[in-house]
Structures are given as structure tokens and as C-alpha cells.
Amino acid sequence: MLPASAYTRRGATIAGQELTGLLDARKVLDLFRDGATVVLQGLHRYWPPLTRLVADLELELGHPCQANAYLTPPGNQGFAVHSDSHDVFVFQTAGSKLWEVHGPDGAEEVLLEPGVSMYLPTGTPHAARAQDTVSLHVTIGVNQLTWRGLVRRSLEPLLAEVSDDHLPAGHLDDPSRLREGLAARLEELADRVRGLDAAEAVERETTRFLTTRPARLSGGLLGALAEDRLADDTVLRRRPGPCVLREDGDRLRVLLGDRVLTVPGRLRPALERVRGADELTPADLDLDPQSRLVLCRRLVREGLLSPVDR
């Protein structure tokens, strides 16, 4: 792994403030010629096909995902044998790479060519070397949520209510000063843990996941300019990503990935229609003209819909 100074530059300023971390394209090209692998970290944030793939995969799996790409010169190796703390799907897209994969029975060589993929479970030692031509592969990393994490997040509100008073002085000489107090607090905590509602904890976990995904703002400026011009026949496209509906009394909570939208419960049929469509117009919604335009403008503003320029 090269230090950032090897491929970035300094000296650029804006309003007198120095900018840091700026890529130096000439340095990158020179390093690539010398055998370095170019890593496009978090490519799903910038390339729409991967944005859609990662968004769909996160909804299917219920785990955060990310995508990176690795461009390696012919005959070179990007990293020494290493393992990752998350599951990895490898997709070879150009050239070929010979992978060294270590398992319980030792190392195995696997040749990946365009169109071939491979799954590497968490902790699998591996390395890869480009063959006779430049190699490009994409990895999808699955950052698994765990039972331990879920239990910890479920208990955090209870632990936050435990008194933060100081431990009594002299407890090193008289451990009973701690023993009795700890036993009482553990017993109280155990009673409260037994009273936890698992359904409520799961709902909080689902809401947390579906409100902490990356915002869908590509084309958002055009959408903002078009909001006031929306008409019944305006074609709107459903953006990729979450749209999960949760009833909350007579209201409806719409989990949109990076936020929660709360609307009257009567809008559920219209939102079901929006959720299941690739494209639609406000006139397609079974609402009065004013209500459907208000709803569609709001959904454009929230990033669920975007006007189609035709």
C-alpha cells in the first residue's frame, strides 16, 4: 500500500485554504507504468450501474455493501496474501487474474477471466496476479451485520440508564462494597432485559438500516428546477433504493434509505403504486389532482422520483 503522498499533490488553494488529498494524475500514471494497481475505492458512489447493483443487493441481503475496482498492469500483483473482515464477491471484467486462495486444505490457484466470479468468505487469505494483459476486476464487499451487534444495540438504551456514580472508595480492600452493588444492578438489568420487546428492537434495527443508506441525489438539481412544472402527464422515474412502508397509527412512515417521510395513512395505495413502478405519471395515482401533484413533488424532493427529460 503506497502512502497518499505518492499519488496526491499539494499546493492548490481555494479562498486561501489549502486543499489536501487531490489526486495527481501524472503520478498515478507513472505508478501504474511501474506496476502499481489503481484502486477505485467506493466506485458505487460514482458509477450508476454499480450504484443500482449495490442498492438492490443491500435490500436483498439486509447488510451494507460496497464496490471497489482494481486495475492491475500485466504480470503484476496488487496486494500480498491478505484476508478481509467482510465477505467478498469478485467479478472479473477485463483481462485475467490468477488467484491464490487459501483454505483448510492449503492454497489453491483459481484463474478468473471476464464473466467469471468468485466468492471469498470473511477471513479467507488470498492474493491475485494479472496475467499477460491489463486486468480489471470489481469486488462487492458485504459488511455483515451480526447477532452480537444487534444484541448490543438492543441493550444500549438499558445500559445508558445504569447509574454512572463512582465506585466506592476502599473496594480494593473490601470487595463486598462492589459485590453487593454490582449484584443489585445486574439483577435490575436482567429484569429489564427480560422485559424487552423483541419486535420493537427489530423494528428499530430495520429503521436504522433503512435510514442510513447513501442519499440518492443524482439529478437532484434538475428535479428541484422541475418541481414547480410538474403536471399530471409528467413522466417520473423511480430511483433505485429503499421504499419501505410502515404503518404508525393513522400515519404511514416511508423509509427512503437516508430518511423517513411521514404521510397520512390514506396515501398507502398511491405509494404502493409508486414503489412498484419503473415509470409513472401523477395521473396514474388514484388521488384527486391536487393531492397527487403535491405527493409527486414531495417524492421528487425526497429523491424517490425524478422527472424524465423527453
Label every model-predicted segment.
Residues V142, W147-V193:
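Active-site-adjacent segment of 2-oxoglutarate/Fe(II) JmjC oxygenases
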Residues L2-L61, H171-A231:
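A short, N-terminal "cap"/entry segment at the start of jelly-roll beta-barrel domains
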Residues G195-V274, R297, V308-R310:
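Acidic, low-complexity/disordered tracts enriched in E/D and polar residues
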Residues Y119-P121, V308:
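Residue-level recognition of conserved beta-strand edge/terminus positions
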Residues M1-V116, T124-D164:
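Active-site region of the double-stranded beta-helix
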Residues R266, A270-D288:
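Short acidic, hydrophobic short linear motifs in intrinsically disordered regions
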Residues D286-R301:
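Short amphipathic alpha-helical interaction segments
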